Amino acid sequence: MGEASDYVFLVYREEGRVMGYVCFGPRPLTSGAYDLYWIAVDPFVQGCGIGHALLARVETEVKDRKGYLLLIETSSTPSYAAARHLYESGGYRCEASIRDFYERGDHLQVFVKDLEQAPQQEALAVDRVPAIA
């Protein structure tokens, strides 16, 4: 067994099949800010609301842990357009952009949502998966 981690993994399954997952955790050196590290949905079921429901579940989990701010970092490239749309339609704002962060022409974009100001969305029932260190 490795050391304990602050990462939280949640997995959504239908009929035993993994349809999506998220990974999030507290942002180091902050009090109440969390990072969404990963969100992934099976390509065959994208567009069915699973991404929104997983985001809502993360928001609930963060608030249950006394968190109030959720940050998501992503790329500015066209291949991440669907992810950016998911965040924006979920009430996240692009608060910062760092030009050429990943490489020339690929900028880091930081999306943020204040969970104390946002209305509650419907969350999915998901399985908790222990972090692997």
List each language-model region with its residue ranges:
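Conserved GNAT acetyl-CoA-binding A-motif
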Residues: V62-S76
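Acetyl-CoA-dependent GNAT
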Residues: M1-F44, H52-R57, E61, R65, ...
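Conserved active-site alpha-helix within GNAT-family acetyltransferase domains
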Residues: H52, S76-A96, E103-D106
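Residue-level signal for beta-strand positions within conserved beta-sheet cores that form or flank
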Residues: G32, Y68, H107
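Short hydrophobic/aromatic beta-strand or adjacent loop that forms the aromatic wall/cage
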Residues: Y7, D106-V110
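Residue-level signal for secondary-structure boundary sites
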Residues: Y80, A118-Q121
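Flexible nucleotide-binding loop
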Residues: C48
